[in-house]
Amino acid sequence: MSKRKRVLVKFSGEALAGENGFGIDTAVLKFIASEIKELIENDIEVGIVIGGGNIVRGVSAAKDGIIKRTSGDHMGMLATVINSIAMREALERSGLEVRVQSAIKMEAICETFIVGRAQRHLEKGRVVIFAAGTGNPFFTTDTAATLRAIEIGSDMIIKATKVDGVYDKDPKKFKDAKLLKSLNYEKAMSDDIKVMDDTAIALAKDNALPILVCNMFKAGNLLKIINEEEAALYSVVK
């Protein structure tokens, strides 16, 4: 019997806002839930990390000096908890079993992150959503996602974005931008390529964790990527 694949999918908070640019678009939640359900139905174990930028970004909140950076980051962590609860509701409504685990204790709302418990949930076919980042300021949710992926023994981390993958330059500004199907960790950390922050990429490199970047709004693409189908559209950093 072949080993089941285990993946961690990272969604940005901004993506949850849809066209509104702020808050949570329930139509986006419903779409993501259908994509995750397809993975579970194909015997794939799924962990999720969601950013909080649709509600508040720690760096932006601290920009004018009124709010300290540490407080801004704590606000950002709480924003990820809000998004995680919303995602849990959408996934449960689609018929899936879900657990939210927070890096910060809030027992009345969700479980506290314990790696062994998270792994057991995954083995039982439950989706696990990891909230509150790493629990520490100055670390992005990309770094938190990479850390959790390594801790749970994920085969890969998938960064689900609004574009088809990693380009050699901004495809919104340059019509001749080219999609890079594969690139190494060093290239991914270069100034002209923005995949994740350098801390997240360095962590992935040190642990040989592949980073796959794809468009979250292409139906069925997540499953195609995990199954390594030719029709899958994504970039891989390894």
Curated annotation (Swiss-Prot):
Organism: Campylobacter concisus (strain 13826)
Coarse class of the protein's main subcellular location: cytoplasm
Residues binding UMP: G52, D73, T134, G135, N136, P137, F138, F139, T140, T141
Keywords, alphabetical: Allosteric enzyme, ATP-binding, Cytoplasm, Kinase, Nucleotide-binding, Pyrimidine biosynthesis, Transferase
Compartment(s) where it occurs, according to its Swiss-Prot or TrEMBL record: Cytoplasm
Protein name, per record: Uridylate kinase
This protein's encoding gene: pyrH
Pfam families xrefs: AA_kinase
Top EC category: transferase
CDD domains, per the entry: AAK_UMPK-PyrH-Ec
S-S bonds: none
GO biological process entries: 'de novo' CTP biosynthetic process; UDP biosynthetic process
